[in-house]
Amino acid sequence: MTKTVTRAGGASGPQQFQSGGETMKYEITRRRFLAASSAVLAAPAIVTMVRPARAGTTLTLGHGAAPGNPRTVAAAKFAELVAEKTAGRVTINVAGAETLGSDAAMLTSLRTGALDVTANSQGATSALVPELAALGLPFLFENTAKAMQVLGGPVGAELVKRFEAVGVVPLDWWDNGIRHLTNSKRKVAAPAEVSGMKIRTPADPMTMDIFQALGAATEQIAFGELYVALQQGVVDGQENPLANIDSSKLYEVNKYISLTGHKWESTPFLMSQIAQARLGGDLEAVKAAAKEAGELQRKLSADKDAEVLAAFRRISAIEVTEVDREGFAKATASVVESRRSPSGISSPRSNRQPKAEALSAREHPMKSLSNLVELTARAIVWFARQVVIFSGIALMVFMTANVAARYVLAGGGFSFAQELPVLIFPWFILGGIVLAAHSGGHMAVEWIYDKLRDGARSTAFVAANLVSAGAFLMLGYQAYLVGEIAGIEHSPVLQLPNSVGYFALAVGSVLVAIVTLAVALRVLRLGWDHRTNTESGEVAL
C-alpha cells in the first residue's frame, strides 16, 4: 500500500523532487523499506563475497591474559593447530586481554552460545562447578605436575561430568601457575607480617579466605585495574603467578615479592556444547589441538616462571624473599578445615557460606524467600539480556535502513522507521540498567564502604540497595501514571500510543527493583563478599 505524504503548502500525493528541470516521483512504500532493510542485512554477505571463498566453521576464543603471557601464546598456537588439523575447515578467532569482558562475563557468553571457547580462571569457573575450587586449597600442590596427575585421574573425570551438566565441555586443563604475594609496604617472610595489609584478590572465596586467615583485609578489583590500584595505594599488595606479575608489570608498583606458593590454580580450557555441536566430524581434531596447545601452555608457564624469577633476582629494585612455607601452611590450615566433612573435602565453598547452610528452622523461610527472589532475578536478567540484544539489533537495522532510503535510494526516508527507534530505545536502556543492577553496579559512594567493616559495611550496602529499590518502584509508578495520560495520543504513522516509552520505564523500574532486592538479600544472608554475582560480575585473573 502506498503512503502519501503532504508537503507544506501543497497537494497531497507522492513526494516530488526537482532535478535539472525534471520531476522525479518517489513513492514511499513498505516494499521499498523491506528492500532497503534487505540491503542492510545483506551487507556482510557482500563483504564476504569479495574475500577468498572458504567454507567451514568459525569459532571465537576469549581469554583475559595480557600479550606475552603463556596463555596468550598457547591460544594463538591452538588456532594455528586447529586450522592445520582440519585443513582450514575450522577457524579460531582469538580475543585476549579481556576484550570480550571479564572471565565471568565470558563464561556467561559461553553458556549462551555467544562465545565458543575460553581459557578461563579457576575462581570464575568455580561459580559453575564449585568442586573445582578444591584445586585451590592452600598448599595442596607443590607444582603443576602433581596437579595434572590428579586431573588426569578420577577427580578430573568427575569434574568433566560436572561441567558437561552445565552445558560446558572441558577440552583441557591449562596452568595458571603457583601463586605468590607481592606488596609495596615491607618484606614478608612470615605469616604474621601479612597481618594488617590490604590485599587485592580475585572474587574467589578460597583466595579471600586464605588471606583473611593471615590477618589481611581483602579487596576485589578487576585485574585490568590492578596496576593503577596498586600505584595509587588503594591496596597494598596482590597475589598472582610470576608470569602474570611480569606480563602486567606489577613489579613496578610492588617491589616486595614473597614466594609464598600459597596455592596452585588451573586455567580450564572450555568449549560450549553449542559450539561442539557445530563441529561435527572436526570435533576430535579440535580436541587434539587443545591437548597439544595445553602441553605447550604448561611448558611455557613453567619456563616463564623460572625465567621471570631469575630476572627478578637480578633487579636490585625488586626484593625477592623466600618464606616460611610451613608457617604459612599452619596459619591457613583453618581454610582447609572449614571445607572438611566426615567423608573428606566437601564441595569447596567459602567459610562464610555455612552461615547460610546453618540457618535455624525459624530462619529457613528467609532462605526460601531469598532463593525465590534470586531465581526470579535470574529470569529477569535473562529477559533483560534478550531485550538488549534484540532491541539493539532492531535499532541498528531500522536506523541504517532509514539512512539507506534517504541517501542511497534518495527516497526521503521512512516516516515509520523514524518513529520506531524512539519506541525501542527506552527498552534498550532499561534492559542495560537491569543487567548493571544485577551485577551490583548501582551508583554508590565506595569510599564510605571502605571506611566501614564487617557487619556495618553489609548493613550500609543493604540499606543503600533498599533505598534504590524503593526509588525505582516510585519511578515506575509515576511512569505508569504518566503513561496512562500519554496513551491518549498516538504516533502519526504507526498509530501506536505515546505511552509505550513510559510503560517501558515502568516495567524496567520494577525489574530493576527486584534484582536490587535480590542483591540486598544475598548480602544480608551471605555477607559482604557476595554483593557481586559471581556468574555475571567481575571476576578476573
Swiss-Prot record:
NCBIfam families with a match to the protein in the record: dctP (TIGR00787), TRAP_S1 (NF037995)
Entry annotated with the keyword Transmembrane: yes
Signal sequence region: 1-55
Membrane topology qualifier: Multi-pass membrane protein
The protein's name: Uncharacterized protein y4mM
Key words of the record: Cell membrane, Membrane, Plasmid, Signal, Transmembrane, Transmembrane helix, Transport
PROSITE patterns xref list: TAT
Main location group: membrane
Free-text description of this protein's post-translational modifications in UniProt: Predicted to be exported by the Tat system. The position of the signal peptide cleavage has not been experimentally proven.
Bias-annotated ranges (Low complexity): 341-351
Cell location: Cell membrane
GO cellular component, one term: plasma membrane
Family the entry assigns: Belongs to the bacterial solute-binding protein 7 family.
Natural source organism: Sinorhizobium fredii (strain NBRC 101917 / NGR234)
Bilayer-spanning residue ranges: 379-399, 420-440, 466-486, 500-520
Region spans: Disordered: 339-362
CDD domains: PBP2_TRAP_Siap_TeaA_like (cd13603)
One of the protein's GO biological processes: transmembrane transport
PANTHER family on file: PTHR33376, SIALIC ACID-BINDING PERIPLASMIC PROTEIN SIAP (PTHR33376:SF4)
